[in-house]
From Swiss-Prot:
Essential component of the cytosolic iron-sulfur (Fe/S) protein assembly machinery. Required for the maturation of extramitochondrial Fe/S proteins. HAMAP family: ciao1. This is Probable cytosolic iron-sulfur protein assembly protein 1. One of its GO terms (cellular component) is cytosolic [4Fe-4S] assembly targeting complex. The lineage of its organism: Eukaryota, Fungi, Dikarya, Basidiomycota, Agaricomycotina. WD repeats lie at residues 12-51, 71-110, 148-187, 193-233, 278-317, 326-379, 401-440. GO terms for biological process: iron-sulfur cluster assembly. Belongs to the WD repeat CIA1 family. Residues 107-116 have a biased composition (Acidic residues). It comes from the Eukaryota. Residues 107-137 are annotated as: Disordered.
Length: 440
């Protein structure tokens, strides 16, 4: 039996917190806010056995490491780490994208010797002689500001190999930038296919395929066509009716408390204005499965949709397979973790297990879903129907940020596999919270 255990609240932002993101290689958690700052929290993970922890196991210890006072003029809406963990991108409502790196301030002597240096900084990790940094204090500095969007930047993200950076905006555009040496970025594509505000982007975990979600109710899938340039190869539009979320009476009490509404909650939910299926709904968020065969989306009606890739070619089509009722209001954030060793057989994973999907949104709930499918077919093009895929809630927390919306959830997914089952959330109350999935 699993549950969601709170590890506490971290020093909060002064205004709503919008995005949280774990560094993939270092013990750092980043958050951003309307207050225009980026906060970096360091943490120590106690040694533990493989698999998910129990509720009595030692907890990770977090501390505020740095408050970055950005030069952004408005809300910092989105942040994303590069795969090597050395670079952090920030997208702001001032229409710009900031690129941040940890650097060492040059001494006065070094400034005179290196007048050609960019600003008064050099990358952390090397000194002027090419040796180690010698314990010198490091600072996070904006090494590049990318301009081009005409309105609020809503989301940023690096491709899986770190070679590309993408951004999207209220101006209906999606930009792709090529990462070059010395903090240089070249715009290689501007896609203007959406008819409304583009809310989020998500890179495929292994390939250069970019998904974007919009207020226009569409999900666009783009890739670099070898015969031309970056282009949209499919436009996905939700169509399946939702399957009601059923919580058996035999479910753990904490799951029933979180997901089965009381009479008062039912009355309040009935008064909410949720768009019916026949009306277009905003697609707020996207998340790829770790194997790249599935794409999850969340929207205004509170449901979660799963889309299956029907082939192995870069431009293979995706098909909507499932739409399950999940939240009572808009789903603002999704995050998909790799499969974890099961409690029953630590150290092994079920080949049909797609991992855990975390969802959060306007109703203040965090829900953890387990998703399983039949074993991988011999043919990558073999499709799965909605009766074969299983999505079920295994842990949940209501009022995770009090009465406030939850704007972001993110799993701790590291190369060294430390921090399994740990995730963070950011809310309108400005707080950043940390949770973990534990075994009772």
């Amino acid at each position: 039996m699993l549950r969601l255990q709170s590890l506490g609240s971290l020093p909060a932002h002064a205004e709503p917190a919008w995005t949280v993101s774990f560094n993939p290689t270092r013990s750092l958690l980043a958050s951003c806010s309307t207050d225009r700052t980026i906060r970096l929290y360091s943490y120590i993970i106690p040694s533990s056995s493989d698999g998910l922890p129990s509720q009595d196991d030692s907890q990770a210890v977090f501390s505020l490491a740095k408050v970055i006072e950005t030069d952004h003029k408005r809300t910092v809406r989105s942040i994303a780490w590069s795969p090597d963990g050395r670079t952090l991108a920030s997208g702001s409502f001032d229409s710009t994208v900031g690129v941040w790196e940890e650097v060492i301030p040059l001494s006065d002597d070094e400034e005179e010797e290196d007048e050609g240096a960019q600003g008064v900084y050099k990358p952390a990790g090397v000194d002027s002689d090419g040796d180690g940094d010698g314990g010198k204090e490091k600072e996070w500095e904006c090494v590049t500001t990318l301009e081009g969007h005409e309105s609020e930047c809503k989301s940023v993200g690096f491709s899986s190999d770190g070679a590309l950076l993408a951004s999207c905006s209220r101006d209906k555009s999606v930009w792709v930038w090529e990462v070059q040496p010395d903090a240089d970025f070249e715009c290689i594509a501007v896609m203007m296919e959406h008819s409304q505000d583009v809310k989020s982007i998500a890179w495929h975990p292994h390939e250069e395929i970019l998904a974007s979600a919009s207020y226009d109710s569409y999900i666009h899938l783009a890739y670099d066509d070898p015969d031309s340039d970056w282009c949209i190869f499919q436009k996905l539009h939700p169509s399946l009716p939702s399957t009601p979320l059923t919580i058996p009476s035999t479910s753990p009490s904490h799951l029933i408390d979180a997901l089965v509404p009381t009479e008062e909650e039912k009355k309040a939910e009935a008064e909410l204005q949720v768009p019916p299926l026949e009306e277009d709904e905003t697609v707020w968020c996207l998340a790829w499965s770790p194997d790249g065969r599935w794409l999850a989306s969340g929207g205004d009606n509170g449901g979660i949709r799963l889309w299956q890739r029907t082939g192995s070619q870069p431009d293979s089509a995706f098909k909507e397979i499932l739409h399950t009722a999940a939240h009572s209001r808009s789903v603002f954030s999704l995050s998909w973790s790799p499969p974890y060793p099961s409690a029953e057989s630590a150290g092994s994973t079920d080949s049909t297990d797609l991992g855990m999907l975390a969802s959060a949104g306007e109703d203040g709930k965090i829900i953890i879903w387990q998703i399983t499918v039949p074993p991988s077919p011999s043919s990558a093009s073999q499709e799965i129907d909605n009766e074969q895929i299983s999505i079920r809630p295994i842990a949940a927390q209501k009022d995770a940020h009090g009465v406030n919306d939850i704007n972001s959830v993110a799993w701790c997914v590291r190369e060294d596999k430390k921090g399994w089952g740990m995730l963070s959330s950011a809310g309108d109350d400005g707080s950043v919270k940390v949770w973990r999935v534990v075994r009772d």
